[in-house]
């Protein structure tokens, strides 16, 4: 099981803050700003200006490019109630000093204390605790499989719904 989500920066400047506000996205708060705006800077490396490219590979690997970070993230089980989350950051030998500095700065976006990854880690911990607590039980959530595919936005549950369809097939349900 695997999937790929790619977000490409539009060639025409768009007001993404307005789009988030219009959809009442909880994390969109007026008045908040980064102390270091360069954290979200980007140097174009590929033909398309890709801001996010995330490829989860079941059961425990995620290969991702967020802005200029290149990361392989592994979830390593350490027993029924523990796991280790390992981040491998990459760069290229021929990176310019500016690119290397940007990659190091943007490592603060992802990783164990990253601005983005904190929620992922917390969600994984919640699943781990629930699995240990209710290991002899099972549940079924349809995840709205009948919902139409929505591919014009990344603000969707389509990928996770499709993952669970594939997982059910893999597990013989």
Predicted feature locations:
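C-terminal catalytic domain of Rieske-type non-heme iron oxygenases
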Residues: 1-173
């Amino acid at each position: 099981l695997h999937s790929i989500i790619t977000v490409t920066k539009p060639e025409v400047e768009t007001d993404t803050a307005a789009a988030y506000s219009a959809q009442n996205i909880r994390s969109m708060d007026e008045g908040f700003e980064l102390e270091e705006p360069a954290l979200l800077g980007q140097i174009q490396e590929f033909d398309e200006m890709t801001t996010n490219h995330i490829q989860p590979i079941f059961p425990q690997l995620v290969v991702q490019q967020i802005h200029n970070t290149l990361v392989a993230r592994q979830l390593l089980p350490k027993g029924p109630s523990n796991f280790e989350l390992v981040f491998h950051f990459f760069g290229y030998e021929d990176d310019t000093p500016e690119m290397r500095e940007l990659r190091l700065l943007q490592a603060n976006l992802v990783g164990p204390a990253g601005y983005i990854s904190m929620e992922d880690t917390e969600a994984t911990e919640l699943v781990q605790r629930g699995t240990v607590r209710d290991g002899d039980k099972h549940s079924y959530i349809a995840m709205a499989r009948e919902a139409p595919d929505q591919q014009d936005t990344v603000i969707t549950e389509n990928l996770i719904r499709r993952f669970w369809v594939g997982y059910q097939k893999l597990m013989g349900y």
